[in-house]
């Protein structure tokens, strides 16, 4: 079985992520999505919990017509040592042969560890980024809903995501400031 790893934070998942998974599954039997920075939540850069992101990803992929039996989603907490992070990913994920990433540093780590690394398939990269989605939510601009699957927008609304981001923007929840 040919498996690929697709790491990301998915804060929140958007249509570009759905496109990437669909394209990856054209080349492999199964994709392992690692939800990174799993220990962070309720802060501006990482407002959603790992569980919420897994929920959003599953619903987004389902909405995108992706066969969830070919997808494994696992949370991966960050560690301060990058090689330890790599080891943690390898220990938490089923065996994989290929890594898809748009992050040059992640690509370097996996290449040096002997993995085949491929460029993450991109779709409308100028518009589709989780950072942009969070910025639009924070501004109260309803255009953010066009960038994510309807299921993701519904989850963000159901959990009070806009209010969470507004409060996170105050900076009181940033652990490094305590």
UniProtKB/Swiss-Prot annotation:
Keyword Repeat on entry: no
Family: Belongs to the archaeal NMN adenylyltransferase family.
Species whose genome carries this gene: Pyrobaculum aerophilum (strain ATCC 51768 / DSM 7523 / JCM 9630 / CIP 104966 / NBRC 100827 / IM2)
Biological process according to GO: NAD biosynthetic process
Keywords: ATP-binding, Cytoplasm, NAD, Nucleotide-binding, Nucleotidyltransferase, Pyridine nucleotide biosynthesis, Transferase
Annotated InterPro entries: Cyt_trans-like, NMN_Atrans_arc, Rossmann-like_a/b/a_fold
Protein's recorded name: Nicotinamide-nucleotide adenylyltransferase
Gene Ontology MF, one: ATP binding
Subcellular location: Cytoplasm
Keyword Nucleotide-binding attached: yes
NCBIfam families the UniProt entry points to: arch_NMN_Atrans, cyt_tran_rel, PRK01153.1
Chief place where the protein resides: cytoplasm
A GO CC annotation given for this chain: cytoplasm
EC number: 2.7.7.1
Pathway: Cofactor biosynthesis; NAD(+) biosynthesis; NAD(+) from nicotinamide D-ribonucleotide: step 1/1
Reactions that this protein is recorded to catalyse: beta-nicotinamide D-ribonucleotide + ATP + H(+) = diphosphate + NAD(+)
Signal peptide extent: none
